[in-house]
From Swiss-Prot:
Cofactor detail note: Binds 1 [4Fe-4S] cluster per subunit. The cluster is chelated by three Cys residues, the fourth Fe has a free coordination site that may bind a sulfur atom transferred from the persulfide of IscS.
Note: The thiolation reaction likely consists of two steps: a first activation step by ATP to form an adenylated intermediate of the target base of tRNA, and a second nucleophilic substitution step of the sulfur (S) atom supplied by the hydrosulfide attached to the Fe-S cluster.
Native organism taxonomy: Bacteria, Pseudomonadati, Pseudomonadota, Gammaproteobacteria, Enterobacterales
Major localisation: cytoplasm
Required cofactor(s): Mg(2+); [4Fe-4S] cluster
Name of the protein this chain belongs to: tRNA-cytidine(32) 2-sulfurtransferase
Family in the record: Belongs to the TtcA family.
Length: 311
């Protein structure tokens, strides 16, 4: 076997392993939050970025083996930004044989008219985009709207709200729209951004730049993202621990009187499970909750070189 063939098999093995992990993450999120049900028509919002490409690919993959039947329709909103490559997504989706719709709305022109030069346009743009996508979902008869936010996005939003908004509020994996007509799901909620990036690189998706609008990036979110990346580098497993914390909320040990009846605690009240810690020293496990050792993609299991592509 030549060196090139050996490398090719190794790369394929690693890609299969990565795809299997992403499939597992997405499958668990779908099951935990009942994201997809029998007969659902899922509108997959495709921006042309790594996250939405990965979401579509994994959902298509799961569709082949899922115990329920559901359909997918990819939707892209062409906001008429200068330089937007209109041909990329139609060509890609037609090659895949995926049902799709390109919605053309000049939200770029509206935003430029309303927002002064140099100001961040993301907020208005997001509201306009949301309304158009909700309308499109109704037109297509979609029962669910799938967005490509991942685990890192959810954590960033939690810290953004804590640092700048004074709220412990993240980004829900599943929600009902304000008008009560649309269910939004985030199938990548359990997926790590670095896994998505590696998968997108390996699959060579035709990525469309996200800076075509010329808007300044959300500097506050960038600060949070840099902070989390630094923590992940210096303290392996802490990101997993923090995400696990979002799934293990104990209202009786916070300070929100809307979530727990502190005033109602009197002599004779029921005992709060785990509540008698006032004089105890905190017991923190040495190994972070939810942490798993980082897999070394350079280590090749010779016994599994001939693994077939994940179906």
């Amino acid at each position: 076997m030549s060196q090139n063939q050996e490398i090719s098999k190794k790369e394929q093995y690693n890609l299969n392993k990565l795809q299997k992990r992403l499939r597992r993450n997405v499958g668990e999120a779908i099951a935990d939050f009942n994201m997809i049900e029998e007969g659902d028509r899922i509108m997959v919002c495709l921006s042309g970025g790594k996250d939405s490409y990965t979401m579509l690919e994994i959902l298509r993959n799961l569709q082949q083996s899922a115990p329920i039947n559901f359909s997918l329709v990819a939707v892209n909103l062409d906001q008429k930004q200068p330089g937007f490559p209109e041909h990329v997504l139609p060509e890609y989706l037609e090659k895949l044989g995926v049902e799709y719709k390109i919605v053309e709305e000049n939200t770029y022109g509206i935003v430029k008219e309303k927002i002064p030069e140099g100001k961040t346009t993301c907020s208005l743009c997001s509201r306009l985009r949301r309304g158009i996508l909700y309308r499109t979902a109704t037109e297509l008869g979609a029962t669910k709207i799938a967005l490509g936010h991942h685990r890192d996005d959810i954590l960033q939003t939690l810290f953004l709200n804590m640092f700048y908004g004074g709220k412990m509020k993240g980004m829900p994996p599943k929600l009902m729209s304000d008008d009560g007509k649309h269910i939004v799901i985030r199938p990548l909620a359990y997926c790590r951004e670095k896994d998505i990036q590696r998968f997108a690189d390996a699959k060579a998706f035709p990525i469309i730049p996200c800076n075509l609008c010329g808007s300044q990036p959300n500097l506050q979110r960038q600060v949070i993202a840099d902070m989390l990346r630094d923590w992940d580098k210096r303290y392996p497993g802490r990101i997993e621990t923090m995400f696990s914390a979002m799934q293990n909320v104990v209202p009786s040990h916070l300070c929100d009187t809307n979530l727990f009846d502190f005033k109602g605690i009197t002599h004779g009240s029921e005992v709060v499970n785990g509540g008698d810690l006032a004089f105890d020293r905190e017991e923190i496990p040495l190994q972070p909750a939810g942490w798993q050792p980082e897999e070394d993609e350079n280590q090749l299991d010779e016994l599994r070189l001939n693994v077939v592509e994940v179906k």
